[in-house]
Amino acid sequence: FGLIGMITIFIAISQTFINSGFSSALIRKKDCTQADYSTVFYYNMAMGIVLYAVLYLSAGVISNFFDEPELKWLVRVLGLDLIIRSLTLIQGTTLTKRVDFKLQTKIAVVSSILSGVLGILMAVEGFGVWSLVARSLTASIISSILLWFWNRWKPSAIFSRESFKELFGFG
């Protein structure tokens, strides 16, 4: 299970680049526009896809560096979490901005319980480290679905350079 620890380093660094402080900038800004939210959403999506592609392509190098052949596919599969989470950063940010921690907690509890049950069942069935991968991806997928269902914010077809510059200056 140390393999997951090795991957977590790369995932955590990538997550930092995906957000780039934009969530904090949106929370700080008093009157966020639809253009602000949509701009950050598309930036997060693009960064999630680009960083996943980098992880996917470098999975063999990472695997060779740690001398762990199984790491190649673990990185590629668990790296999908970057894309999934990039789709929900704005959803979580809008809930935080509205101070709706109750809904955030409900979503976290439901996704943790359901993914935890799956992870335990897979571990009992002998899936080993893949049970942790499935648990992590399942938690992100469930959380994403619930955030999109209950939050109802939808992106517009807007990417504003002005919004990007203003918000990036904070992050």
Language-model segment annotations:
Residues 1-6, 60, 64, 72, ...:
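Membrane-interface helix-loop junctions in multi-pass transport and translocation proteins
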Residues 13, 17, 45-57, 83, ...:
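Generic alpha-helical transmembrane segments of integral inner-membrane proteins
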Residues 40, 74, 90, 104-107, ...:
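Hydrophobic alpha-helix/TM-entry signal in multi-pass membrane transporters
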Residues 25-34, 84-107, 121, 130, ...:
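Membrane-interface junctions at transmembrane-helix termini in multi-pass inner-membrane proteins
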Residues 102, 145-171:
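Interhelical loop/hinge segments that connect adjacent transmembrane helices in multipass membrane
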Residues 2-5, 67-75, 163-168:
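Juxtamembrane helix-entry segments on the extracytoplasmic side of multipass membrane proteins
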Residues 30, 62-70, 126, 130, ...:
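Membrane-interfacial segments
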Residues 3-7, 11-60, 73-79, 102-103, ...:
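Membrane-water interface segments that mark the loop-to-transmembrane alpha-helix transition
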